[in-house]
Amino acid sequence: MINNLVKTILEQGGSIHPLLIPSEDTNGTGLCNPSIFIDQERIFVNLRHVQYTMYHSENEQKHPSRYGPLSYINPEDDITLRTKNFILELNEDLSIKSSNLTDTTKLDVPPIWEFIGLEDARIVKWDNKWYQTGVRRDTTTNGQGRMELSEIEMSKEGVKEITRWRIPAPGNDDTYCEKNWMPVNDMPYHYVKWTNPTEVVKVDPINKTCESVVLKTQKLNINRDLRGGSSIIKWGDYRIGITHEVDFWYSETEHKDCYYYHRFIIWDKDWNIVKHSDCFNFMTSRVEFSCGLIEHKNDFLITFGFQDNAAYILRIPKGIFENIIGFKTGFNWGELPTELIGIISEEIFQDKLYEKYNEVKEGDIVMDIGANVGAFSYSILDKNPKKIYSIEPSNTLIDTLKSNLQDKAVIINKAISESTGTKNEIEVGVHIYNNEGSQYETITFKDLIKENKIKKIDFLKIDCEGGEYDVFNNENKDWILKNIRYITGEWHLWGTPDSLNKFKHFRDIYLTEFTDYKVFSRDNEDITDRMFDDDYLLNYSHGLTHSAQVLIYIKN
């Protein structure tokens, strides 16, 4: 979990901007849950005003109200939970240029439930029309919620609602509450209704219909429902949004309480989820909510509310955002499976797995054995290494690898093997992605060094599905010990005696030469002190089979 995202962003060069309008417009009650849209460089925000002040007892909750830790403080003459919406235009520095209350009087009817008005409206422009779209619950006596699409007209005279449509749920329209659908900014009249698994609906304001157009079966292993939050925006070849999660419960005094969390979700063009962040809070409050996300020049702007009493814009520089979420939108993943993209992205771009203890430095000579589509090599380009050698045998991956690295690395389309030449089939215990049934070139590590006139390697990253034992063999020992400074990578024990014996041979002729190294299991347990326990290694190898890998970090 990312605790206090705002603090993390501020420490790395981002900024936060409060959204405040005159108190005579609000009578001093809450402002919250803003959304944001940019149209031809003009920045617009929908700011929710609630006719109450919410109180929530935080931390150890030593000071709850008589109504429990969470309560609403209303004006004496109106105890309903009433919402109004203001449209703000912002200056380039995110200060407020203008503020106008949305005039809804043309379409208002007497409410028949206690939650009144359009709640958590997202502002969007579709087909050259401006809309506020959120949930309304005041049209039935039991508070049935439905998303509404309210067209607004913005002029010098102000903001007016000119049409209002209550969107039916897809199918039988018999659900109780539909809310927090996330409008897809670049797809008019489309919403992400559910995230996990993903459901996308298309609404038709002319024929008054709503239908599901995407129904995915992919299910993330997350223990809370992923509910809607921000709008969905394009990000390179992907789409990204912010969801929210809630833990609701009743205390021992039968009072309602909750925790809110948020999460970044990235979809590909076919609505497969390729990456999600850890859950996070904005400023450590239990009650926070985000309705807005937009790309603005070199930044992302996130709008969020704090305890229904304050509204903010968080500005995140794109580079910081990519580091936090661990995903590079300019990186070409080719035809890699969605699940594998998520794994590689998290390991390399987010967790910096191979640089956990020793980092690539400016001027280093780096060798990336098992480069795949180039994620690790790509991730270190901004460190300005002197040279990168990226070795990848798969003919299927090589074009994508070249497109990612171009002339920034020496790309070698060969497999490290016990001999130099050509092979027609995959060796037992060695997996080359999507290369089965085709020829591939092989080269010994010794010949690789000789052909490329490599005198030293500052940083060796190796993950080549069993081929590591053809690097760390008897023949190469002297050169490796004398000329490689940092070694990091994955060693495969699999579940066969041969692989286990190869690992023990590596251990006995290499690890015994190093005094500064660490070994971790795939679930990040430090097992350095178990490496010379043969019974442990036997159980590890045969018990985990295809998960029987270890990560080793060596400082030579």
What is the meaning of each model-derived region?
Residues M1-K328:
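Beta-propeller domains
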